[in-house]
């Protein structure tokens, strides 16, 4: 599956993103019997069913939520979906605007924004804009990055614009006009700690990522 990335026609393709996902996964299944059972169960799922896609996306988001509940040391925090929807209702994004989350976690903000905008897409061009030129995110943690990509794919965005990087490590002076976005939908990256080199990017030099 990792070869998907090498054989893809470009980074903005479903094949490339699938390769990204499996490139980050380090788990191994040593029992052939267990692997066969997993494959058999997976084969019964209809991934083209919108209902099953949403169920799977909820499972991925629950994983992030459980990571946070197990202890805040990992810096994983789950934002309740009703709160996200309320924020989107206040902002009222429009098709053609770009939406960015610099610490996107499971991409809950981006998924909910897509669900808000999708009914407003009356033309094929609108759907193409939502698919390719609307939602952008960055995520530092490997597992959350993988879950974000899977979550967006399951919601209907086939080639998510999610980058595996630490947003706080970027020098503000290097940000160009093309890197700007119309809307930022995000929570501060609660619960994390940053090394001193990263702190140099900010006027207030503290390790706490939320500040």
Language model region names:
Residues 126, 190-211:
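Mobile active-site "lid"/loop adjacent to the S-adenosyl-L-methionine
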Residues 1-5, 16-26, 44-53, 106-115, ...:
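Phosphate-binding glycine-rich loops and adjacent basic patches that engage nucleotide phosphates
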């Amino acid at each position: 599956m990792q070869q998907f990335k090498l054989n893809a026609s470009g980074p903005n393709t479903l094949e490339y993103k699938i390769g990204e996902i499996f490139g980050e996964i380090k788990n191994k299944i040593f029992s052939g019997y267990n692997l066969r059972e997993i494959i058999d169960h997976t084969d019964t799922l209809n991934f083209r069913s919108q209902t099953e896609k949403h169920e799977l996306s909820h499972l991925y988001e629950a994983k992030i939520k459980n990571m946070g509940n197990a202890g805040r040391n990992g810096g994983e925090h789950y934002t309740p979906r009703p709160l996200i929807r309320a924020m989107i209702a206040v902002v009222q994004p429009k098709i053609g605007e770009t939406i960015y989350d610099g610490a996107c976690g499971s991409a809950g903000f981006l998924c909910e924004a897509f669900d808000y905008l999708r009914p407003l897409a009356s033309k094929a061009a609108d759907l193409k804009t939502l698919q390719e030129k609307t939602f952008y995110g960055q995520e530092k943690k490997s597992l959350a990055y993988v879950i974000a990509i899977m979550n967006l794919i399951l919601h209907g965005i086939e080639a998510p614009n999610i980058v595996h990087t630490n947003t706080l490590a970027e020098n503000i002076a290097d940000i160009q006009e093309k890197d700007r976005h119309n809307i930022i939908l995000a929570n501060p990256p609660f619960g994390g700690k940053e090394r001193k080199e990263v702190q140099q990017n900010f006027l207030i030099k503290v390790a706490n990522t939320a500040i």
